[in-house]
């Protein structure tokens, strides 16, 4: 839309992964219609204080959209006390549902347009989408099997507790951070604060080891799967100075163990020492 000249887009970024509130305030103008924010960065794992940002956006008269792709399931989001107008998240990440599932919360202030028209299984006498949510945005046959799988995932997360799941993953990452801090060759991309982090950590690799080659070596020789490259987020890598090669991202889950981390760190040591 910005390329077509329909809207004016302003990006607010931070090198350490934590957005400065004053930077957001300074970027807003009387004509600002929407502020969109990723709650937890998929590259760095850093978590933004949406509880502080949301009232500021509301006071400016703009709508507030939160991308909770990396936070839903591991970070509490209180829609009753936090003025959020849109909250979007997929089901296949920390909610452990099937791919192709997700949800969009639409607050009472937001008035979206129907993005498609079709049968809803009710109110068939109306030629357009029903006014009632969520049917207004859900034309066509719903993904019943996907929703059932997502519900099972949500129940699993609820039984264990989002904070317990997050803490387990962050504790494993803390072991990696400790190893990196003792290394002369490796660096953690962005800031590290275990209390404001989810289970993703990017490593800036030594100059002689492209991230893609490291990821391939980890996979082929140690059966370890990590993500290398730009992680669908080129702008943050430009800010980090890791563009165009990107970083090596580690994202342990609830089934990962300390032994898994030990194997990962041993593998990095062997690869960078030239053993392989």
Language-model regions, residue ranges each:
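Pyridoxal 5′-phosphate
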Residues: 1-276
């Amino acid at each position: 839309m910005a390329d077509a000249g329909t809207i004016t887009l302003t990006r607010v970024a931070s090198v350490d992964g934590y957005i400065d509130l004053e930077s957001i305030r300074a970027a807003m103008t009387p004509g600002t219609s929407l502020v969109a924010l990723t709650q937890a960065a998929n590259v760095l794992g850093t978590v933004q204080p949406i509880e502080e940002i949301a009232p500021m956006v509301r006071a400016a008269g703009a709508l507030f959209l939160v991308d909770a792709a990396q936070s839903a399931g591991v970070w509490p989001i209180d829609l009753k006390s936090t003025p959020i107008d849109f909250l979007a998240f997929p089901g296949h990440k920390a909610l452990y549902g099937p791919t192709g599932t997700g949800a969009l919360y639409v607050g009472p202030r937001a008035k979206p347009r129907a993005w498609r028209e079709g049968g809803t299984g009710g109110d068939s006498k109306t030629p357009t989408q029903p006014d009632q949510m969520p049917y207004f945005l859900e034309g066509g046959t719903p993904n019943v099997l996907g929703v059932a799988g997502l519900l099972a995932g949500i129940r699993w997360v609820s039984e264990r507790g989002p904070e317990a799941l997050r803490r387990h993953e962050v504790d494993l990452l803390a072991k990696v951070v400790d190893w990196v801090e003792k290394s002369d060759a490796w660096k953690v991309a962005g800031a590290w604060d275990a209390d404001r982090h989810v289970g993703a950590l990017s490593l800036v690799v030594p100059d002689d080891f492209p991230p893609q080659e490291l990821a391939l070596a980890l996979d082929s020789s140690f059966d370890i799967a990590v993500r290398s490259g730009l992680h669908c987020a080129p702008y943050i890598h430009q800010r980090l100075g890791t563009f165009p090669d990107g970083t090596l991202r580690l994202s342990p889950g609830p089934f990962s163990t300390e032994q898994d981390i030990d194997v990962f760190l041993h593998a990095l040591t062997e690869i960078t020492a030239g053993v392989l």
